[in-house]
């Protein structure tokens, strides 16, 4: 009796390419390190500024509502207020609570970070670029220089393609 031979079918996996035009988080770690160094701010404080950026006017209770997900820091609100990241917009009065908003300094910092995330070169006038204090700062500095070069070349390519 002849033996049956089963033909094995070979499955071919398809590669589904994704649209990476909005890949702004690719270099987030380096951008965050640069921003923390440039603005001399902590990572939770920066996250709080990102939250407040779109809030407009807010109460202190709204601030503390988002603050609960960070490590415990009772002085965060006071520090951001004293350092000029947020400002009092309205004093409290009978029947009204005080209102706060992000300062021009805070809005400009977050706006700059968004621009960098969308491909603008990072400024090299930060403490990280002035002196090589630690090995990690040197590594980040070299990586950021490489990124800036890549961002500039990409911007030039887009400029020549659109003409």
Question: Which positions does each model-derived feature cover?
Answer:
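Short alpha-helical segments that sit at the start of domains
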Residues: 15-48
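Short amphipathic alpha-helical elements of helix-turn-helix/winged-helix folds
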Residues: 48-55
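Short amphipathic alpha-helical interaction segments
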Residues: 68-82, 96-97
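Short, cationic-aromatic polyanion-contact patches
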Residues: 41-42, 91-116
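Short acidic, hydrophobic short linear motifs in intrinsically disordered regions
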Residues: 55-67
